[in-house]
Amino acid sequence: MTKVISLSLGLTVGILLFSQIAFELSYEKCYPEAGNLGIVRAYYHNLETGESMGDDGDIYDYSVFAPIAAALAENMPIEVEKATCINSYTANGNYYYENQLLSDDEQCLMVDTCFFQTFGIPVLKGNPNDLINSNTLFVSESFARRFFGDADPIGKVLILERKTEMIVRGVYRDIPENTMFKADFVVSVHKEGGYKDGAGWGGNDIFYAVFRTGEASDIEVVNDNIQRMVEKYMPTEHNGWKLELSVIPLATKHQTSSETTKRLVIYGFLGFSIFFVAIMNYMLIVIATLGRRAKSVGVHKCNGANNGNIFSMFMMETGIIVLVSILVCAFIIFNARDLIEDLLSVRLASLFTWGTLWVPLLVVVLLFLLAGVLPGRIFSHIPVTQVFRRYTDGKKGWKRSLLFIQFTGVSFVLGLLLVTLMQYSHLMNRDMGINTAGLVEAESWLDIEIVPHMRDEIRRQPMVESVATASHSVLGQYWTKGLMGSDGKRIGVLNMNYVDFNYPDVVGITIIEGKPMTHAKDLLVNEEIVRLKKWTDGAVGKPFDEIKEGTIVGVFRDVRNQSFYQAQQPIVLIGGNAFNHTFNVRLKEPYDENLKRLNEFMDKTFPQVALTFHTVDDMLSEIYKDVYRFRNSVLITSGFILLIVIMGLIGYVNDETQRRSKEIAIRKVNGAEASNILRLLVCDILYVSIPSILLGIVIAYFIGKAWLEQFAEQVDLNPLLFLATALIVAIIIVACVVLKAWHIANENPVNSIKSE
């Protein structure tokens, strides 16, 4: 039973983590002739300082100007067969079907007419050219089944923001999950001969440009010519910054991201740790039975069995145990599928496809070979003479080596757990510069005329303390432009949020210098702007060149609007009272009950308006959900590996006390106390555990440091905390040894000696 539990746990986690790695390595390879797909990327760098800006954790920005895709197809018709313009940034509005708001899980993209042909996605119903109409919508097969059942989806209507009808004109085959362009439905990106939110060349760079070539080698030709092509349409230098365009195969984007590489390396370490700890534990348990099973091996050899027969017998035994473990593993995965899918952010049906099924099969084969070959070889080489005498070879070297690997693995995983627990706690409890308790928010583009009335009606409600509107959510990137220094050179990216005068009070922003806004174009700047501008004499009263006719009336404490994934941004709040996108409401207690009452009031009073309020705390949790999932993955892995190691350690101690029972009895006859016996066994374990624990903790420290590099704000990794973790692991090991050996240490030595 112990062997089955050990292998089942190791097999479960190993299969899931290694399959996740294979899944991510298959990103963007789900399309026909995926090697012919390319994506445009931008490289912004300062010609004087060499400073660069990127959105992939490195130096490249994959969001570019809307016309680039069409220009590629027009200027390079020989190489580029099709090119498509995609917007995922502003695609996800509030969509309703039969007056029910679609879940946030329903993903949407804004695409042009060439989207399906470029990617090779089959269109099952409808004409993709209908996407030229701005109110057109295509849905996936699964979306059509979920919402329309057996009815024909063509002509069905979804309502955007409860005011714009979006008509279903077609159905396409589901897009697999291993792509950045997964969409349950797509809407047209076209508008009045241009692109929604585009603003042409040099305008809004929020679009992906993906193209298909005739041959994979043509991507390099496009790369050689794209810069010259763009320079035909717009200047690529401005204020000392240079824009350079290049292209890469789409399939390499995800794999070459530094964040992806780090994540997969960590998954690999975790999977390797628990998988091999489980195998080592199985070997340890099997080898521990050597003394008891030697005689039966000798009997088999006396009856004509050779080494090969004995080896086959033990491989057969391992095969049966592995088969049972596979069944237990399948049972665990099937019954915990919801938890697993949440932790890995992928459906099991996508994780285990025909293309990736080789991963679990390879894991099972490796498990069988590694767990069976070594024990089988050891048992097959037991001399036939052992049938006549007791086999006393304890294989101590093997056992200690196996224990060393197990202790290293468990200390590594627990050390990594320490890092994830501390960082997640740091992210969720760190001061964001706003007061999130009781703060709720809703976003929707509304007619400016109705906003004052809605604001007043919300303010009058008994559950509401205060309300303010703004152009942007308090969390996320605002409208941006270059922040210039006194020498006219760019010193940062300015985030601009247009807000009501009482906005700072509502969201809990602290003004540390000056006064609140009271007039249009009054400006509040954050501490980061003061630092970058080097205003040592104060900022109040100064004009702000980036905002025409604006005057700074105060300085507020820094707000981490882009979370702690990003460095602190320079922010300016621009005062006014005519903003129609984001409603910020400060609720009275009890918050959860009053949030429910507020949303009920909105549905009843303003049924034509798509405003659903959510807590800012929930928005933060959503931002950090990947950290939360990773933390839980490490937590579960830690629990599994600790259980496996404890089972193996108990088996080892049990075997050692039985094998050395006569030695222990003789020591007691010669005056040794129980404490002396326990000290003997504990020291024997510590000889192995101390160096292995320290090795595992050191590995965890460096892997944890690599994982933390994705955050601009990192928890301090105090070495003393890692030493404390090592001490806890050592205490657990010693406790297991003492508890298991307590009986034999206190047993009457006569009971052990009389059997001789």
Regions found by a protein language model. Give the residues of each.
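Membrane-helix entry/capping segments
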Residues: M1, Y31-P32, Q227-S273, G291-R292, ...
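Hydrophobic alpha-helical transmembrane segments of multi-pass inner-membrane transport and secretion
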Residues: M1-E24, T260-K295, L323, L327, ...
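Intracellular coupling helices
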Residues: T2, M280-I321, H381-T392, M647-V688, ...
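Small-residue-rich transmembrane alpha-helices
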Residues: I15-S19, E231-K232, T318-H381, M422, ...
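Membrane-proximal extracellular/periplasmic loop immediately following the first transmembrane helix
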Residues: L17-G93, G198, G202-R212, A216-N225, ...
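Generic structural signal for small/hydrophobic residues in well-ordered secondary structure
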Residues: E24, V40-A42, L72, F116, ...
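Short juxtamembrane loops and helix-capping segments at transmembrane helix boundaries
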Residues: L25-A34, E48, G54, D184-G194, ...
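Mid-to-C-terminal secondary-structure elements
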Residues: V111-K125, L137-E259, D456, R460-I623
